[in-house]
Amino acid sequence: MAISDWPEQDRPRERLIKHGAAILTDAELLAIFLRLGVAGKSAVDLARDMLNHFGSLHALFSASLDDFSQLNGLGPAKYAQLQAVLELTRRSLSEELQIGISLNSPQAVKKYLQLLLGGKPYEAFAVLFLDVKNRLIACEELFRGTLTHTSVYPREIVKEALTHNAASVILAHNHPSGSSEPSAADHSLTQALKQALALIDVRVLDHFVVGGKNVYSFAEHGHL
């Protein structure tokens, strides 16, 4: 049965308008995004199939076009729409950070970094450059590696910090494996970067490791 044939009070779009998005299930929210189902399935049914197939919203959002298109009714057009929504969300969070106030909230930074790095199939290392008032000057992905490794060069980060006239930095990288637990190499790198940046009076405020739904903070665990 098509959603248009459902009682009005049960339709996801009408429920969202009346009660707000927070009360809807993941499948209902996806159904609003999809708009239409396929033969024999409503948009909600198709959304449930998507969630069952990928296992989680995070896995769905991180899927490649080939993986996304495996389900009947999904293809390049829907994939492009989804990526556009995700990019708009990233940019919205980036705007919040640029205001400056959000940088005083580790949770806001974590959410932004999850969107920025969480879905990447390779290891990436990013740096947030901040001014003396902890306002974001720039966020740059400086290094990109393989599934399990990326090479980070302290001199390049020092160079960028000088270019941006940064007073402090926040370091971040992802683990495509899904684990946010830092490795021994991560700990060594953090200390090496901290020492290199201290030579130019730039503080390392935190180092976040993004792994799936979890984000590890070096500062919160007393490792800085």
Curated annotation (Swiss-Prot):
Sequence motif: JAMM motif, positions: 173-186
Residues given in the record as Zn(2+) binding sites: 173, 175, 186
UniProt superkingdom: Bacteria
Similarity field: Belongs to the UPF0758 family.
One Gene Ontology MF term: metal ion binding
Keyword Oxidoreductase: no
SUPFAM superfamilies: JAB1/MPN domain, RuvA domain 2-like
Gene3D superfamilies: 5' to 3' exonuclease, C-terminal subdomain, Cytidine Deaminase, domain 2
UniProt-recorded name of the protein: UPF0758 protein mma_2551
MPN domain span: 102-224
